[in-house]
Amino acid sequence: VMEDAAEAMGSTYKGRQCGTFGEFGALSFNGNKMITTSGGGALICRTEEEAKRTMFFATQARENRPYYYHEHIGYNYRMSNICAGIGRGQMEVVDEHIARRRAIHSLYTEHLNGYKGISVKQNPSEEFDSNFWLTCIEVDPAQCNGKSADDIRLYLETQNVESRLLWRPMHMQ
C-alpha cells in the first residue's frame, strides 16, 4: 500500500505520523505545503533496503561500474541539490510552520463561531491531530440566507482575503 500523505506532514492519527501507515508514504514539498523545495517531495520507506532500492531506480538504475551501464529501466526522479538544500533548511522550521497553521485554524474557528450555516471543519475525533494545512469551512446556504460558498468566496475576495472552493469529488467532475 502506497500512502498518499501529500498534505499531511506533521499530522497524526492515534499518535502515529501520517505517511507511515502504508508500505511507502509520499509527502509533497510543493510551494503551498508545510515546507517547500519549490516542487517534488519525499518517499517514506520502512527499511534501509527499500530506501536503497528506491534510490537506485530513482537515479536511472545505473549499476555501480566505472561507466554507464544499466540492467534495469530507471528514472530520473532526483531532486536538485539546491532544492534539497532549501528543503533541509525548512525542516528546521517545519514545527513552527505547523504551529502557525494550527493557530490560524483556531482564529477562524473563534471568529466564525456563532455564524449560522458556517462551520469550520475540525479534527473528526481526538484520535486525529491535523496540521490544518488548509482551514476548511462548510457553508449551508439554507442557513446563510441563501448565500453559497462561492458567494462568500467572492465577498472575501473584495476584502483581500484569499479563499477558494475545494476539490470536487472525482465522480462529480
Task: Identify the function of each model-found stretch.
Residues 1-2, 29, 41, 101:
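Hydrophobic packing within well-folded, soluble alpha/beta domains
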Residues 15, 22-23, 114:
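Active-site acidic short loop of glycosyltransferases
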Residues 20-58, 81-84:
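Active-site PLP attachment segment
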Residues 12, 48-173:
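PLP-dependent aminotransferase class I/II
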Residues 1-3, 25, 163:
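Hydrophobic faces of well-ordered beta-strands that scaffold small-molecule active sites
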Residues 9, 18, 35, 75, ...:
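Short clusters of hydrophobic/aromatic residues that line enzyme substrate/ligand-binding pockets
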Residues 1-15, 47:
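Catalytic PLP-binding core of fold-type I/II PLP enzymes
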